[in-house]
């Protein structure tokens, strides 16, 4: 089980990402136009003024059950440990143990 503060920190990041998504997208949209170097620097400064945790690349995928960040399967939203347990208990429909 992940520490509770790590899970809460991740929730806070997700809120910031959603809050600043449109603003960040607008600023980046103006950056793509043909601008002078000085104008590009000003736009970069605007981006840097936004909170650091509002950028999507700082988001970390976490298991919804345990909060574990490593060994994460996107399709299920679970870590490998929980995925294995749930699949053995037939709690995930359509998932079965491989045999070849």
From Swiss-Prot:
Report the subcellular localization. Plastid, Chloroplast
This protein's GO CC annotations? chloroplast; small ribosomal subunit
**Which InterPro entries does the record match to this protein?**
Ribosomal_uS14, Ribosomal_uS14_bac/plastid, Ribosomal_uS14_CS
User: Could you tell me the keywords of this UniProt record?
Assistant: Chloroplast, Plastid, Ribonucleoprotein, Ribosomal protein, RNA-binding, rRNA-binding
Q: Name one GO biological process term.
A: translation
Which residues does UniProt call coiled coil? none
**What's the superkingdom here?**
Eukaryota
Q: Which Pfam families match?
A: Ribosomal_S14
List the molecular function annotations (GO) for this entry. rRNA binding; structural constituent of ribosome
Keyword Chloroplast present in the record's keywords: the answer is yes
PROSITE patterns xref list: RIBOSOMAL_S14
Where is it chiefly localized?
plastid
Q: What family does this belong to?
A: Belongs to the universal ribosomal protein uS14 family.
What assembly does the database describe for this protein?
A: Part of the 30S ribosomal subunit.
Which NCBIfam families does its entry note? Answer: PRK08881.1
Question: What function is annotated for this protein?
Answer: Binds 16S rRNA, required for the assembly of 30S particles.
Write down what this protein is called.
Answer: Small ribosomal subunit protein uS14c
* Originating organism: Gracilaria tenuistipitata var. liui
